[in-house]
């Protein structure tokens, strides 16, 4: 029997394509880099920021450091306003919470606490794990395993709702059921 429903964030709880593309393009402009190309735009929604930055820097430590420096002092609010959550997200999550424990397992990092509040989901999740926890990002199973540990639920009694290949791979590696959306 399923006891825990874990959710990815981007592409599952909300549409973040416009927000993520604008976020990375803003950072890249600040460090003199061109905007994301089409392939990078796809990765910008699913991959951790550290992976997107590392791929763009191509081994250039100074460029990578400059990207991280820009993010330390930037205002996230304009990018949060571009997120497209369904109007019924909070009521849906509260209804689900009556029957299951809920968790958020995402490759996002520093934006997670503010994102949860922005979406009106404060107090909804029984466990949250992200790249902010200093674990390997998905497709590694670490983020999902950390959610399981924090929720106190065995993998066989959990399901992960995701929208990408890396979500499916993380779920399989963590030994949890998977529901693909999008």
Model-derived features with residue positions:
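Conserved SAM-binding loop
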Residues: 6, 13, 104-105, 160
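Substrate-recognition/cap helix-loop segment adjacent to the acidic, metal-dependent catalytic center
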Residues: 22, 29-31, 51-59, 82, ...
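N-terminal helical cap/lid subdomain that shapes the substrate entry/recognition surface
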Residues: 1-98, 122
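Short acidic capping loops at alpha-helix termini that bridge into adjacent secondary structure
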Residues: 36-40, 123-127, 155-159
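Acidic, Mg2+-coordinating phosphoryl-transfer loop and its flanking beta/alpha structural elements
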Residues: 159-182
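Short, flexible loop segments at the rims of nucleotide/cofactor-binding pockets, characterized by
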Residues: 78-84, 107, 180-182
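Short alpha-helical
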Residues: 19, 48, 110-111, 165-166
């Amino acid at each position: 029997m399923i006891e825990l429903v874990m959710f990815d964030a981007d592409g599952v709880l909300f549409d973040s394509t416009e927000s993520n593309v604008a976020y990375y393009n803003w950072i890249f402009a600040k460090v003199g880099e061109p905007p994301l190309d089409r392939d990078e735009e796809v990765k910008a929604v699913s991959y951790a920021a550290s992976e997107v930055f590392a791929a763009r820097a191509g081994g250039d430590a100074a460029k990578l450091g400059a990207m991280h420096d820009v993010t330390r002092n930037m205002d996230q609010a304009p990018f949060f306003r571009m997120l497209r959550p369904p109007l019924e997200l909070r009521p849906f999550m509260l209804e689900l919470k009556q029957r299951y424990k809920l968790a958020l397992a995402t490759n996002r990092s520093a934006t997670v606490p503010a994102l949860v509040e922005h979406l009106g989901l404060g107090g909804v999740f029984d466990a949250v794990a992200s790249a902010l926890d200093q674990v390997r990002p998905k497709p590694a199973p670490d983020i999902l395993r950390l959610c399981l540990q924090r929720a106190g639920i065995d993998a066989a009694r959990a399901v992960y709702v995701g929208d990408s290949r890396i979500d499916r791979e993380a779920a399989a590696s963590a030994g949890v059921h998977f529901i693909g959306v999008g």
